[in-house]
C-alpha cells in the first residue's frame, strides 16, 4: 500500500506494520496495489477494483488466506462490487468501469487515533486503511481475522468461482462461521444480499471479541455494488471492536446482542453525526472506539462513530434480508448504535421471506447504486438504521442500504470526481464513484458533514436511531426514530432500507412521526403508490411490486412529461433525479413493497424471496443493472438523459439530481407518499373493483410469473424501476397519475410496465390518457367492466395510455420470450435517446424482469422505436385512441364485443377517434391470444400513437401476429408496426374495422385481423385493401364480417372492410384469393405481389425470434416512410404460422394502403366477398376497386397471395402484376422485403432490418424494400433474405432496372421456397424508387418465382403480363425456369449476411442442387426468354433487369436495358460465351450470361454476393440513411460473401468483398450487375473452392483475393456512386481482379464441391439478377470496359469452369 505500506497479503492489515505511525487510511489501488501487495486482486469487478484480501502475515498471499491471525492483522478488501466478490465472480452492476468508486475504507487498529484518510482511491477501487497506533485491539482483530480468514477463504473460493457459487461459497462460509460462533450465529443471523449478479453473501470478517466469546460472524450477502461502494470496515479500538471485522462486503457483525446493542449505541452517535454515512452508504466497518475514527468510504460519505464505544459494526448496504438478521438487528436497533447492522445478515435462506424483502430491499439498492442516494438518506437514517448488531437483521438493511443509497445519491458523474468529505476533520477523498453524481456528492458531502448530514437527513436522530433499530419492524413504532426507521425499514424491506431511509429522511423532515409504521408500510407501497397513486401500487403489490415500480417509473416520467410535456421531461429533472436516485432504492423498495403489499404482498414476498435468493441474485443484478439503466433511461428522459440512462446506471446516477435535489424530491415524494398513501387508498377504493380484480389477477399473475419462474423477478425489477418512477411521481404528484398507476396496476404487473412505456411513448397527455383507458381494459381481460373502470380512472391522467401500454408490455413480456425483446430493447434504447424512448426502456426493464430480461428488452427496443416515432409525431389524440383500443383488445379476450364498443367509442372521439379505433382493434386482437400478448400489442400500439394514426394501425397488426406466433415476436413486431402509424389518420378507421373483425372472428383471428387492418392504414387505403384479403386468409369469414362492420366507418372505414376480407382470404384460401386477384388490373398487381410474399412467409411460418428481429428492422424502415411501417406490420404477421401469415398479408396490403380511399372501399368489398368466402367475390371486389387507382394494388396483393399459395394463380397474376402502378408496387414490394427478413432468425433479421431502416429514410420504395426483406427472412431462409433485401434496397437507388432485377430474384427465391417471395418483394421495393413500370415488372417477376413449382408456366404468364414492362416477362420466365437461381440468389443474399447465409445455405443447398440439375436446363431453355428480357430491358432497361431472374438479369444486362449495363452484360456474356462455349449461342448478352450461369453455376453462385453488394451500394447511394443500412447490408453482404466463398470459391469471396466496396458507394444495382455478369468466372472459382472449401481455408483465400479484387473494385464503388460510367471502370478492374481471383480459385477448385453445387445455383440466380440490374444501371460502355479484362479471365475461367462445372455436376447430383 502506499505510504510505504508493506504488502502482506493484506486483506488484513497488520497494525504492527505501522505501530508507531500515526493511524491513517492507506489507499489500496485496485490492481497495481494488489499486484504490488502481492495480494489477490480481483480487477474484474465493477472497475479495476481489486478485492484485496490481505490476511495474516502472508504478504504474497494471492488468496489472501489468513495466516496465524496477528493482532495487527486486518482484512482489508479493496472496494469492488462488494468487498468480497468484487470481481470476476460478480460482474459489477454498479461499478461499470474504472470510473466507479470502489474504494473501501478499512480501519484497522484503534481508529480513535485516525489522523486522516488517504486521498482518493484508485479510480474505481480504493482501499482506505486506517491504521491506529493502538494495536491493542489487534489480537481480537486477529481472532476475528482468523474467523474472517476462513470466511474469506470460502469467499475467496467463491470469488474464484464468482459466477458459479458466489452464494454457495458464501453460504458454506457462513455455515462455518455459524459453527464457530453458535451463539453469535443465533444472535447474529446471516443476511443474504439478493442481488441477481451483484449480491454477494459475504461473511464479514469477524474480529474476535476480546471480551466477548461470541464471535461476531454473520453471513452477509451484500450486493457487490453496495459492498464495493459502501463497504467500510470500522473496527473499534477495543479488542471486541477489534473483532469488529471488516468484511469484503458489508461486515455482518456477529457480535453478541450486547455487543450489538453496544455497537448500536456507538453507532447512533455517528448516525446522529453521520447517520446516513455509517448506516446506509458506508458499508465499511465503523470504527467504534474512535468518534472520528469511523470512516465511511463506500459511498463518498464518511461516518464517524464515537470512539468511546467500540462495536463491530459491519455496515451492510441494504442487504440485510433474512429474518434472523432482523432479530439480530432488532437487538442492534434497540441500541441503534450500529447503522451497519444491515451488514449483519441472518440466515439468508432460512428466513426466505425476510431475506426476500431484504434481498429486494438491499439487492435493489445494493445492485443499484442509486441507493447511494438512499445512502445519503441512510446516512441520516444511519442513526435511524434499525440495523444494529444488537438488532436482528430486518428488511431494513438500512446501513447497507444506506451505503448503496448514498452512493446512488452520489451521481455517476461523481464517480470520476474526487469528493473530499470532511467528517469531524476526516478528509476522505472519494474517487469517481459510479453511483455518485456531482450533485449527489455535494448532497452527500453535506450529509457526510455532521451538520449537513443532520440537516439533509433530519431523520437521523442519534437517540431515535437506537429506537429505530432494524428491529424486524417491531421497534419501528416504538419511537419516532423507530417509526422513521420503520418507514425506512419498510422501504428497506421493500426496497432495501437505505432507499426507504432516503425517502424517509425527507419524509422525516415532513412527517417523521406521522408516517412511522403506517407511512412505512404505505411508503413501501405508497412510495410506489406515490407514483402509482395507491391503487396501482396495491395492484402491483398484489401482483408484483417490481412491475409497479416499472409502471410507476414510466408513469411518473410520463406524468412529468405530461405536466411538462415531452420537452418538459427534461424540466422534470428533479423528479427524474429523484427517481434516478431512488430507483435502485426503489428496486429494493419494490421488493419490500412486494412483501408489504396489503393483500398480495405475502404471495409476492414468498415467490420473490425465492426468486430473490435464486433468480434475483443473478436476475436482480441484471435487473438492477437494467433497472438502473431503466431508471437512467426513464428518468433522464425528462432530463434528456436517455442515452446515459439506457447505456448505464452511472448516467442514471449522473443524471440523478444532486443529493439535495434528491432530498427535496424525496421530501416532496414523502409528502406525496403521505398524500398518495391516502390518494392511493382512495384510488384503490375508487378502483376497488378494478383493484380487486387486479389483485386477483395479480395473484394470477404471480402464478403466471411463477409459471414463468422469472416473472416475480421481473416484477421485482419492475418495482425497483417503478420505485424510481414513483419518486418522480412524488416529485410531481398528480391525482391523475395515481389513478393512472392504479389503472395500470389494474391491468397487471406486465400491464404496469407497459403503462410506463405508454407514458413514455405517448408524449401527448390526451394520448396518454387514451392509452391508459385501454390499459384498464387490458387488465380486465377477465372482466371488461373492470378495465373500463381502469380506463375511466386512467383517462384522468395523460399517462394512462402509457400505463396501459406498460400493462401490455408486461403481459407481452410474460407471454413472450424475453431474450429477443431484451436484444431489441438494448438496440432501441441505445438508438433512441429520446425521453420517450428511455421511458419505454424503463418499462421493458420491468417486463424483462417479469419474463426474461432479454425478451422484454427487445420488445422494449421496439417501444423505444415507437417512442422516437411518437416524439416525431406530436399528435396526442392518436396516442390516446391507441391506448384505448389496446385496453379494448385485452378486454376483448374476455368479450370481443367490448373492444368493438370501445373501438366505436374511440372512433367517436373527434380528432382522436381515428387513432382510437385503431387502438381498439389492436386490443381486441391481442386479447384472443392472451393478456400478455395483448399487453405487448397494446403497448406497441400506444407507442405509435404520437407519430400518426396510420402509424398506430400498423402497430396493432404486428402485435397480433406476434401474439399468434409468440409473445416475443409480438412485442418486437408491435413496436415496429407502431412506427408505420405516423403516416396518416387513415389507419385509425382501418384499425377500428380490424378490431371489429378480430372481435367477430375467434380471439386470435380477431387479433390478427385487427392488426392487419391497422397496418394498412398507414400507407394507403389500397394497401389496406390488400391487407384485408390477407387477413381473410387468416381469419376466415369472421374476419370478413368484421370488415363489413368496419365498412360503416368513414371513407377510411371502407379501407378497413377491405382489410378484413383480405384477412379472411388469407385464412381460408390464399390461393383462391390469388386467383381472383389475377384479373385485377396492373395497379392491383402490386399489392397482390406483396400478399403472395407474405403468404409465402406464411408457409414457412417463421420463428417468433426472427419476427422480432424483423420488427426491429421494420421499425427502422418504418421510420422513413409508410411503406416501411407496413413492412413492420408484415413482419409481425409472419411470426405466427396462421396469424402471422394473415398479418403478413395484411401488412402487404397495408403498404399499398396509403394510395387512396379506393383501397378502403376495395377492402370493404373484399370483406364482403370474404364473408361469402367466395374467391370470385374477392376478385370482383378487387375489380370493383380497380376503378380506384390504388384499389388494384390491394386486389393485386390478394392475387399475389393466391399466387403464393397456388402457382397457377401466381402465374396468372404475374401478368396482372406488371400493370401495377409504380407507386403502389413499390409499397407492396417493400412489405415483402420486410417479411423476408422476418422469416429468418432474429439475428439475420436484425442485419436486414438495419439495412432496411437506413434505406427507408431515403424513400418510400426503400421503406417498402425493408418490408419485403422481412417476409423473406420470415419465410424460409432469413439469412439469405437479408442479403437480398440489402441488394434490393441498394438497387433501388441505382435504377428501376436493378430493382426489377432484384425483384425477379426475390421471386425466384420465393418459388423454390417461400423465402424467394420476400426476395421478390425486395426487388419490387427496389423497383419502386426508379419507376412504376419497373415495379410492375418486378411484381410479375415475383409471381413467376412465387409459382416456381410450375416454373415454365409462371414465367410465360408473367412475361406476357409484364410485357408492357419490357423486362417483366423475360425475367419472369427466367425466374420461373431458374427458381433454383432464385434460391441461389437468396443464398447469395444470405451470404451477404453470414448468419443468414449459414441458415439458408443449408436449406437452399438442397434446393440449389435440385435446381442446379433442373435449373440448368431451364436456364439453357430460357435463353430465348432471357433474350426477351433483354428486349424488355431495352424498353424499360431497369425494369427488365429487375424482372428477369438470374438469367433474366444477365440477359437484360446483356441486352442493354437502355443503360450501359446492357453493353457490359453483352460483353460479359460474350466473355461467358468464349469461356463456356456451351452458352455462347444465347442472345449475345442474355444467352451468354445464361450459359455462364449454366456452365459457371458455381461461379454465378459466388457472383451473387457481388451483385448484392452492388445493390446495397446503390441503396447506399440513394440516400444517406440507406448508407447506414447499406453499411450493415454491405457487412452482411461481406459476411454472406464469406459464406459464399466458403461454399463457392476464393474469388467469389473476393468478389463479395469488392462488391461491398462498390456497394458502399451505392451505385445502381445494374452497374454491379455487370460485375455479377463477370462473376460467373468467380462462380467457377467458387465451385473449385467449394470442393476444397469444406475447410474454411478457401474462404480466407477468397478474402485475400477479394482484397486484391477489392482494390480494383474500390474504384468501382466510387464510380458507381458517381455514375454508371464510373461503375464500368471499376467493373473492369473488378473483372480483372475477378479473373485473377478466378485463377486463384482454379488453383483451389477442390475445396468445396458440394458447396459449389449449391452455391453455384444460388449464385447463378442471384448474380443473374444482380448482373442484370447492374448492367441495366451500368452503361454498356462501362460494362464493356470490364469485359475486356474479363475476357482473358473468362478464358482462364473457361478452363476453371470446365473443372468447376464438373464439380458442380457432382455437387448438384
UniProtKB/Swiss-Prot annotation:
Compositional bias of kind Basic residues: 257-272
Region (Disordered): 207-226, 239-275, 451-663, 763-973, 1211-1382, 1408-1516, 1539-1571, 1589-1653
InterPro entries given in the database record: CRACD-like, DUF4592
GO CC aspect terms: acrosomal vesicle
Self-association and partners: Interacts with TOP2B.
PANTHER family: ACROSOMAL PROTEIN KIAA1210, KIAA1210 / KIAA1211 FAMILY MEMBER
Protein name, entry field: Acrosomal protein KIAA1210
